[in-house]
Regions:
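Acidic active-site catalytic centers that drive phospho-/nucleotidyl reactions
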Residues: 7, 17, 99, 133-136
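Short, glycine-rich nucleotide/cofactor-binding loops
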Residues: 4-11
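Active-site-proximal alpha-helical scaffold in enzymes
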Residues: 14
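Conserved phosphate/ATP/ADP-binding segment of small-molecule kinases
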Residues: 112-155
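Conserved phosphate-binding/catalytic loop of the ribokinase/pfkB sugar-kinase fold
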Residues: 47-52, 104-124
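Conserved N-terminal subdomain of the carbohydrate kinase-like
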Residues: 1-2, 18-98, 102-105
Length: 155
């Protein structure tokens, strides 16, 4: 089950997750956390989906289907991060993979400091695997840390 915002170009976000999961012969279950306005040049806007709707989407599927893993991408809001953390409490045996999307590939900031703090406190401790790129890793740990070994220990 993947939690992420949409990307109408399918180059990232929920659509890319669905394509990737399907290419691995798995059934992609997708929870919309936000709707982006973007093209191949950059992100022009992002609207978070209401956390209650994220909760309802997720719990409806979890009541019907078994899943093998959770994957978090761009979550859209602190409220969405909180509700996803609450859902994960009910499924501690299911591994959580986090791709901490902090900015678009072109550098458009997508996560504020409050959202980053919520991810670090509420989701990272529950994670099985975290997949930041080097820029995300530096931002998550500390701006001045250039040692990748130290970054991996800190994360």
């Amino acid at each position: 089950m993947t939690f992420s915002a949409t990307d109408a170009t399918s180059g990232a976000g929920l659509q890319a997750d669905v394509l990737t999961i399907a290419s691995l012969n798995c059934n992609p279950l997708s929870i919309v956390t936000g709707v982006s306005v973007q093209d191949t040049i950059g992100v022009r806007g992002l609207t978070a989906i209401n956390a209650e709707l994220v909760n309802d989407q997720t719990r409806t599927i979890l009541g019907d289907m078994e899943i093998s893993a959770f994957k978090c991408g761009l979550l859209g809001s602190v409220e969405n991060i909180r509700i996803i953390a609450e859902i994960l409490e009910d499924y501690p045996e299911i591994p959580l993979i986090i791709d901490p999307v902090l900015a678009s590939g072109r550098g458009d900031e997508l996560v504020n400091e409050e959202m980053m703090k919520a991810m670090l406190e509420l989701l990272f401790p529950k994670s099985y695997l975290i997949t930041p790129n080097s820029h995300e890793a530096r931002r998550l740990v500390s701006e001045g840390n250039e040692n990748f070994e130290d970054l991996s220990i800190d994360l």
